């Protein structure tokens, strides 16, 4: 019987080379492990587009930059992710043809799916909470209209929950918008009413 194969760890430089060799694929990198990002549902794609558009519209001419899921962020020296959306207000992250990763994200957004929800809620939440530039982490549900924002408050993180009819505020970038704008054009239902 053959011995089980040991997991192969790769360096950040090897991961970058893998990304250059496969420009149509996105690979997240966590501490020597590489994870291929898969596509999501149409609702996931639409919500991702809506959140980027909403952030762009509400930020207006502010000196912040909104990015979609094609932009990776450097969470630490050994962790790089592709969130569904992110915002940076750091001049180092001004969009240029040379810049390949966001260095100082302030807001990170993940649209939840069945296959990634556990990773987004636990592993990535821990990574994002450890990144000193990230002030807010927004998770958007696809099973029902529900959003949570995890907000840095000194050394702690506070949880803010939003549902239909609510206005979401992202304090770190000074914007407010209706939860409904995130679900525009989708068939994602409202959460069940617990009062019935």
Regions found by a protein language model. Name each.
Residues 1-196:
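Gly/Pro/Ser/Thr-rich low-complexity, intrinsically disordered segments predominantly at protein N-termini
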